[in-house]
Amino acid sequence: MPRFFTRHAATLFFPMALILYDFAAYLSTDLIQPGIINVVRDFNADVSLAPAAVSLYLAGGMALQWLLGPLSDRIGRRPVLITGALIFTLACAATMFTTSMTQFLIARAIQGTSICFIATVGYVTVQEAFGQTKGIKLMAIITSIVLIAPIIGPLSGAALMHFMHWKVLFAIIAVMGFISFVGLLLAMPETVKRGAVPFSAKSVLRDFRNVFCNRLFLFGAATISLSYIPMMSWVAVSPVILIDAGSLTTSQFAWTQVPVFGAVIVANAIVARFVKDPTEPRFIWRAVPIQLVGLSLLIVGNLLSPHVWLWSVLGTSLYAFGIGLIFPTLFRFTLFSNKLPKGTVSASLNMVILMVMSVSVEIGRWLWFNGGRLPFHLLAVVAGVIVVFTLAGLLNRVRQHQAAELVEEQ
């Protein structure tokens, strides 16, 4: 058994531990959301504080991006990610002992830092530890599994709260976090030479400057962040569109989200199982028409035959399937088609994505309340069309980078 563990630690148990950590981080929001009103009432707090449980979690996710990437480039990936798993576990455990809404929200913000650790350090380690094609396929598998959480989380949370207190849910998540912590401690490989670059403010700023001056990174960051807009604006504003304006029940609304997340899961499963080379430009370009057809349905369907949810869900799901086919490849290209420190590149990319997502959600909300369904969906269409051009720029830069590497090898 020890020999089997040693042989498969990096290839099997490390990805499993990372998946569990990522899954637990998602569940810390998705599992508790159906009962967030109960949380507020338990603390005798104002109901208006309920959304803060999510917003502060996301704020925690943005707080340490600038630090963790450069830090992991210098002291190694292992100590940073393992520390993150421990912090998340302790924050979930601490939630069981909160006695006020303020304490609960502080714990939520600390739990949110898991986004920083996973996205900035964990995903980079996966890409570094495995080859290009295997790394992309493994990330597709991780995404497919983790995205089950937004589907089953709310339904499971609502069911479990009929039998147990909401604090017990955080105890369950804390146990999951602790198991992932132990798994990472035992199985995570180190992919960075420690101490190769000294940690100083000057060197960190220089690395960030070099990243944001790299045109390939800029094309990649623009492509990925704009690709998120159609899905994230829908996820954020759809409760208002479907429940408030469309008069759907919360249960009906939950089921309308399944096709969107399910489409991404299916797309990633196809990449992992059936696509021989997901970096092939012809495969990437074949996914683009699927995205554009989905975006077209958002406008054409609602113009010709308006429906409370059909065209919005169908169009967004089709788009999600198309972009899901190439998301892992886009991340790989953006992170590794340069000679820049990967932790800093990952941190920079995540900061751009989170900023664009935040702005796009606010724009989408404003368009819905001031213009209605069609102007709201037009935001997704505009973003999707721009992506075609930024994707062309990204692939052109990647091709130039690969050609330059071949010349250097010769």
Curated annotation (Swiss-Prot):
The chain crosses the membrane at residues 12-32, 49-69, 79-99, 104-124, 141-161, 168-188, 217-237, 252-272, 283-303, 308-328, 349-369, 374-394. It catalyses: Na(+)(in) + 2 H(+)(out) = Na(+)(out) + 2 H(+)(in); K(+)(in) + H(+)(out) = K(+)(out) + H(+)(in). Disruption phenotype: Deletion mutant shows impaired growth in the presence of ethidium bromide and is clearly more susceptible to the effects of chloramphenicol. Growth of the deletion mutant is inhibited above pH 9.25. Deletion of the gene results in a strain that is twofold more susceptible to cholate and fourfold more susceptible to deoxycholate. Pfam families: MFS_1. Residues 1-11, 70-78, 125-140, 189-216, 273-282, 329-348, 395-410 are cytoplasmic. It is found in: Cell inner membrane. Keywords: Antibiotic resistance, Antiport, Cell inner membrane, Cell membrane, Ion transport, Membrane, Potassium, Potassium transport, Sodium, Sodium transport, Transmembrane, Transmembrane helix, Transport. GO terms for molecular function: bile acid transmembrane transporter activity; potassium:proton antiporter activity; sodium:proton antiporter activity. The keyword NAD does not apply. Optimum pH is 9.0 for K(+)/H(+) exchange activity. Optimum pH is 9.25 for Na(+)/H(+) exchange activity. Efflux is inhibited by the ionophore carbonyl cyanide 3-chlorophenylhydrazone (CCCP). Its main location: membrane. One of its GO terms (cellular component) is plasma membrane. Residues 33-48, 100-103, 162-167, 238-251, 304-307, 370-373 are periplasmic. It is a multi-pass membrane protein. Proton-dependent efflux pump. Confers resistance to a broad spectrum of chemically unrelated substrates. Overexpression confers resistance to acriflavine, chloramphenicol, norfloxacin, ethidium bromide and tetraphenylphosphonium bromide (TPP). Can also export a broad range of quaternary ammonium compounds (QACs) and contribute to the intrinsic resistance of E.coli to these antimicrobial compounds. In addition to its role in multidrug resistance, MdtM likely plays a physiological role in alkaline pH homeostasis and in resistance to bile salts. Overexpression of MdtM can compensate for loss of MdfA. This is Multidrug resistance protein MdtM.
